[in-house]
């Protein structure tokens, strides 16, 4: 609890004790009335001040005005206990609402804790100086001790350590880093001392982008929130005028037909009507439900840019994936060596050496599979043949490594390969020596992710890729994806998403999931753009509506389940609050409901709705 909540709780306790003592003591009226007024002012003075300020600023119709009119009117009718009770229970409801917001804000606050307070910079004498991260320029060497946060994105130039990325990803799995590895701000250094050369200013670093995203999330309202805001602006004046009509019209009608006017009875009913009609339960609980949903999601590494996107995700029926980096790891690995005429280890060594001067991902995968240091003194006359492969002399032997076009260029008969992937054919001194199959590996939970989406109510899954048909079909088959479109250029992907959008029903939404690097146009075009694996990707954070901070595709279904739970709670609160209020308004108008039932219809319903809204935080086991 913050200071304001503690102060309000003390006021509630003092007023409650005083109220109970007065009710139990059965004091004379001349003592009881002043004590009730003391209790009333102790608990309600701020509401009266807000109502007065609202009238002064010509912003009359709000819940403070309703409470002030209802309770002052009750005092005028000498219902001092009811006036005090209405104000007391209203403040209890407000305290619950404040506490609930604080509880849901806690997850956001924990995320805000990723913001570093300082960066360690060495001065000319080699001493460490703590400076504001905003003052650190690009290219500065910062020092991160064990237990400290990485202040700014950069590259490790000295040291090795383990980083805790839990605040960013929602996962506790640590990440090992050493020299030349990229690191991002917001991670916590767990073990060794690191020296990092900054590659960005603090304002452009990952942690700043994320904090900006979360801080602005509440400004993008859902349709439900926008409706409730419009509803409250119209509803509050309507019920005020209705209460005035309830107070004036029946007595006037009674006078016309020569019956007693009974103004006191109808004033009491009108005041009861006002208390019942207070729209707090809706106005408070619906934004709180979305706020709690966004807070719970952020705690799981799912960053939602606004409640409108959370609402849209709940109606998602189609999920379209990019392949590379989304459903596959985007890291090529040697999957097999076939038809080798020399030992496989030797063939792999020749391939790695021939490709050692290239920066192509295929070359990197061969070097990784070989695993040893390349002795470049053994390599001569390296020639890269564009679109074909590489020719080199290794230990005095001519080596060819490339595709079938390279083999045809040198008239070397080769073996066809039926495996799916990139095929690197090898020839030694003009004779075919076998081929190496290199494949992009599926992500560990990719298949489970598709199954989870089906269970979450997704009607169709689609994969778009620029890869060849054979590779795309194999991946789609392994993952049980419903449709696959291959050999697409970036613009083709946008066109295909537009085509899919035209086929869906108006109330259904389509989400596109990409790695956020080359997918910005498609992420923007879909109803909901989801970027995954966005740790360190500025493009993803900018282009997407929802950002998954790690590479686990299972988070997609989790995000959908969070959205559905949040919307379910919103509608529960709408139906419950409106239903109870309508019944109580009718009972109040015909004189059956008294002020105590009005208190339940207002404060009781608000507390129940607020407690229900807090459930949107509990998303860990979804």
Can you describe what each PLM-predicted range is?
Residues 1-31, 101, 110, 124-130, ...:
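Flexible metal-binding regulatory segments at protein termini and peripheral loops
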Residues 12-16, 227-257, 272-290, 571-600:
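Bilayer-spanning, highly hydrophobic alpha-helical transmembrane segments
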Residues 19-122, 135-142, 149, 160, ...:
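Actuator/coupling domain of P-type ATPases
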Residues 52-60, 99-109, 288-307, 614-622:
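Juxtamembrane helix-loop transition segments at the membrane interface in multi-pass membrane proteins
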Residues 66-68, 168, 268, 278-354, ...:
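Conserved catalytic phosphorylation-site environment of P-type ATPases
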Residues 242, 505-507, 544, 549-622:
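Membrane-embedded transport module
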Residues 334-460, 469, 481-497:
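P-type ATPase nucleotide-binding
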Residues 396, 422, 428-572, 580:
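Conserved ATP-binding TGD loop and adjacent catalytic N/P-domain core of P-type ATPases
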